[in-house]
Amino acid sequence: SNFSEPLKNMIKDSRTNLLRVIHYPPFLGDEDSKSLRAAAHEDINLITLLVAGTRPGLEAKDKNGNWHQITTDPGTIIVNIGDMLKEVSGGYYPSTTHRVVNPSSEINNDSRYSMPLFLHPRDEVKLSKNYTANTYLKERLLEIGLKS
């Protein structure tokens, strides 16, 4: 892949990086065990860094369509490829499809916390002939209804 600039330069001085703290409350016991806490999706940004969650639940999908539980070992950092890295690499690096499933019954009374750091390129970074980081983000936020 021919990136417009090195990845480390793309995120340098970015004003759109975002750290989220997500709280998944404990279950009451009447939830459907097959329901999802977060449906399968890919992140819009370049790369997501994620400290292992406090409880199991995060799963990633492999290229054959199989789901795999992600570790919650302390000190582990998960690296997810986002749609912007897929775009800038011309599809060479596919976005990580992931979801959060309900916990098993023996741990369902515990809250789950997650802290993803979404790394975004600077607005003017050229992702492809069609997009800068800014135009790509705006288009995607419109698609999912987070921007009008």
Task: Name the predicted role of every residue range.
Residues 1-148:
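C-terminal flanking tails of non-heme Fe-dependent oxygenases
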